[in-house]
UniProtKB/Swiss-Prot annotation:
PROSITE patterns: RIBOSOMAL_L1. Binds directly to 23S rRNA. The L1 stalk is quite mobile in the ribosome, and is involved in E site tRNA release. InterPro entries: Ribosom_uL1_bac-type, Ribosomal_uL1, Ribosomal_uL1-like, Ribosomal_uL1/biogenesis, Ribosomal_uL1_3-a/b-sand, Ribosomal_uL1_CS. GO terms for molecular function: rRNA binding; structural constituent of ribosome; tRNA binding. Gene3D superfamilies: 3.30.190.20, 3.40.50.790. GO terms for cellular component: large ribosomal subunit. GO terms for biological process: regulation of translation; translation. The keyword rRNA-binding applies. Belongs to the universal ribosomal protein uL1 family. Part of the 50S ribosomal subunit. The gene is rplA. The keyword rRNA-binding applies. Keywords: Repressor, Ribonucleoprotein, Ribosomal protein, RNA-binding, rRNA-binding, Translation regulation, tRNA-binding. This is Large ribosomal subunit protein uL1.
Length: 229
C-alpha cells in the first residue's frame, strides 16, 4: 500500500457510519492521487436479483454530470442518422458498425443508443454488448426514436444504475475536484432515484448499506437510514 493511501485510511474510521455530508467531506480529503479521482457510490440493496420482480435498474441525469467525457454510439437509419449526428453522437451507423464490432473487437464508445427498428440488428451483438453493460435498453432510455434527447441526456451526465448479482449498485457521482456541494447534489439525486425504484416485491430493509470512495481512496460508510437527509 502506498504512503498516501495509508494516510487516507487514518482519516476514516471503518466502524463509523457517517452522515452524507461528513462522508463527502472525507472523500474529498482522502482523494490524494495526482489525477482527478472519480468518486463512486456503492449501495447494497435488500433485494434478490435472481428474481425478475426484484431487479433494480434505471437512469438519472446528475445535476453536475460525472466529469467524464462520454462517447455515444447510435444505431439508426434514415432521418435519424442526421438527427443523431446533429445532436452530437460520436458514431452513427447500422450494419457496418455491427460488423466493425464483431470483426475488429471495436469498443471505442461508452454508451449505445438504438432506435427500436434497429434492435433486430443490434440484437446480434447481445453476447458482446451484454456482459459489458452496453446493450441498449428501453428502461434506461437508450432504445428510443427520440435520439436527440437520449444523446443530450447522456452528454449532460446521465448515469445508468443496475443492481448486480450481489445486490449492489455501483455508480460514479462525479470527480473529487467537484467539491462537496456538487458531489452532495449528485449523491442525493441518485439516491432518490434508487429509493423510488424499489420493487414492490422487495421485503424488509431496502437500503442495506451505503459507501462512497474515490478511485484510490478507502471506502467511507454512510448511515443507510440518513441517505435522504
Amino acid at each position: 500500500m502506498g504512503k498516501k493511501y495509508t494516510e487516507s485510511v487514518k482519516l476514516v474510521d471503518k466502524n463509523t457510519l457517517y452522515t452524507v455530508q461528513e462522508a463527502i467531506e472525507l472523500v474529498t480529503k482522502t482523494s490524494k492521487a495526482k489525477f482527478d479521482e472519480t468518486v463512486e457510490l456503492a449501495v447494497r440493496l435488500g433485494v434478490d436479483p435472481r428474481h425478475a420482480d426484484q431487479q433494480v435498474r434505471g437512469a438519472v441525469v446528475l445535476p453536475h454530470g460525472t466529469g467524464k467525457t462520454v462517447r455515444v454510439l447510435v444505431f439508426a437509419k434514415g432521418d435519424k442518422v442526421n438527427e443523431a449526428q446533429e445532436a452530437g453522437a460520436d458514431f452513427v451507423g447500422a450494419e457496418e458498425l455491427v460488423e466493425k464490432i464483431q470483426k475488429e473487437n471495436w469498443f471505442d464508445f461508452d454508451v449505445v443508443v438504438a432506435t427500436p427498428d434497429m434492435m433486430g440488428v443490434v440484437g446480434r451483438l447481445g453476447r458482446v454488448l451484454g456482459p459489458k453493460g452496453l446493450m441498449p435498453n428501453p428502461k434506461s432510455g437508450t432504445v428510443t426514436f427520440d435520439v436527440a434527447k437520449a444523446i443530450a441526456d447522456i452528454k449532460a451526465g446521465k448515469v445508468e444504475y443496475r443492481v448486480d448479482k450481489t445486490a449492489i449498485i455501483h455508480v460514479p457521482i462525479g470527480k473529487s475536484s467537484f467539491g462537496e456541494e456538487k458531489l452532495s447534489d449528485n449523491f442525493h439525486v441518485l439516491m432518490e432515484a434508487v429509493v423510488k425504484a424499489k420493487p414492490a416485491a422487495a421485503k424488509g430493509q431496502y437500503i442495506k448499506s451505503v459507501a462512497i470512495s474515490s478511485t484510490m481512496g478507502p471506502g467511507i460508510k454512510i448511515n443507510p437510514g440518513k441517505v435522504l437527509e
